[in-house]
Structure formats: structure tokens, C-alpha cells
């Protein structure tokens, strides 16, 4: 990670790059392969490889029927649902447990909105555990032509008070929600379950606006140090200038500055499970896994660290789970980091967020990718 400053350009523009390669992605997914963008960052004695699934790791579940009981339904909104799939009951439960927060339900929700140059941005939903924070922001008053991708010029995200202090740094990627989600097998579809469509130029058609003409920007932030926690922290988010993006280039359309300080929920939803099993074909033993409804951290002891392969560190990656009812979610994890946690390379970890909420009590086994050649094994866990 750069030591200059904690300012992130909106560089993780997965939609255009990914969507232009959707056909290739389909073929690879059918072979149970996955495309991912990798970046290796070295910081002191800690080595991290940042990665994000190239088939946009976002998904949605339609809202279920209205309860006959007069109760508040904590609906997370289109963008958050598109980022981390949750059933109606899961949304309700996580919000009532203060793991998630729906800002539009707050009495002072109107005071949270920031308007500049006729464009209003306001926080919508936050879902948090120790390692990851998912944040969605609604955008009103800005419109783009069909076939163009909206975006901000610069997005700055940091925790604490001083963006120059290393302790304030977070890993982050973000983009405008485009209405495209993965199904349980990782194949991209529209949020209503229909197959993707292309325009006359062969580009996949995206759906950035909702029925009200509003958009949502989605951020996934995670800790830099595997021992840090985001619970109860203040997350600063700043957006500058709106425009469009094409092949990585930003074209400004509206100047503006929208600044937010978001206090994250402070309730822990993670539990530590002792595994103590060797990862077959590797020199790694999965000692424990810290797992929550929205992310996990696999903790390894290392008998012998392998030689890296290009940008691959050789650390096994937990990519999915098998549930007790037999359901397989082979592409559950979506973005995260991995690295050796000491200079001797005798310990390592892999942290990753999910593309959908899971019930930790229903997890029977982990699907682990053991090498850059994408060999897979299942490791049963008990709780």
C-alpha cells in the first residue's frame, strides 16, 4: 500500500472491464475457475495480496412478502442488497442486532444528506463486523445517458481523525451499483434473476438507476492490519466531482464535494472456530477461522512457505462454504487480503468479505483453493 496518503481514486471500476469480458468469465466459471485482479502490497514485514473477483462480487435477493404483523422492515436498499445478498429475515435480524444500520430510518436522516451543485448524496446502509464495513450512499439529481458509466472523480476513505496516520488506513474498493449480481455459482445475472443483455455494440447493458432515478455508490472497506477492528470506529468518506468513466478514464460533469463521518456499529458478530487441520498438498495448517455472517479470516501456521508464483503468495484461500443442508457456495468470498503475519513466514492469514450473508451455524465445511492452479479441497469444521 502506498505510504503517501489515504486517498483512493475510484480505480476499482470493475463493471466496464468485467462486463466487456463477461463471455470469457462465463466459460471460466463453468470450469469452476475464477478471474481475479491481484495486487501485492508490501508494508514492513507484512505482505498482502489484494484481490477482487472479476465477476463483480455483488448479489441481491428480492424482498419477501410483507409481514402480517405491524413491524418495521429494515430494508437495506437496492445497492446494499446488490453488494451483499441477504434474505428478508437476515436483513431484519442483523439490523435489530445493530450489525447493520439503515440511515433512512433514523429520525435525523434528512440532516445526514449533503447537497452540492444540485446533487444530493446521503448514507443509506452500513453493515459491519470486525474486519469489513460495507457502506452504501444514495445519489439524487444526477443522470447519465444509457450506455455510460457514472462515477466520482475521487473517493477518499479513512478511519479516525488523521488521514496521514498509518493507523487510519483501510483497504477499500468501490463503484456505482450497476444492477448486475452473481448467482450462487458465480455467474452474472441481473438483480431480478434475468440473463444479461447486450446493446448493439456488444456491451452488457447496466442498470445504474432505480425506479426513482437515483443511484447508489457501494464501498467495501477492510482493515489493513489483520489484528485491527472496525467496530465502533468513525469512517470518513469524501466524494469529489461526478462524471462518467470509460476504459478507466474519468470525464467530469459536475463539480462537487460530499463529505461524511460515519460512526460504525460496535456489535461483534464474529466467532473463532478451532480447525487444526492440514491443508492437503501444502505446507499450511488451518489452525482457526474467525467467521461472521459477512466475512472471515483464516489463520494458518506454516511448515514451509512456498515460492510465490507471479502475484500469488501461495497461501491457501477460503473461497466458499458448504452448508449443512448440502448447499454449496463455491464463490462466496469477494475481495480481501492475504499475507504472512511475521518475518519468519511461519504464520499467515487470509481475510475476505462475502457476496451474501450466511448463517454461521449452518456452515459444515470450507471450500479452500490450495494453489494458483485453483486446486480445491473441502475442510469440515465443527462449532
Language model segments and positions:
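Alpha-helix initiation/capping motif
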Residues: 15, 49-51, 359
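Internal signal-anchor transmembrane helix that establishes type II topology
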Residues: 41-72
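Disordered, charged N-terminal biogenesis/targeting segments of membrane/secreted proteins
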Residues: 1-46
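Intrinsic structural disorder/low-complexity segments
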Residues: 39, 54, 312-314
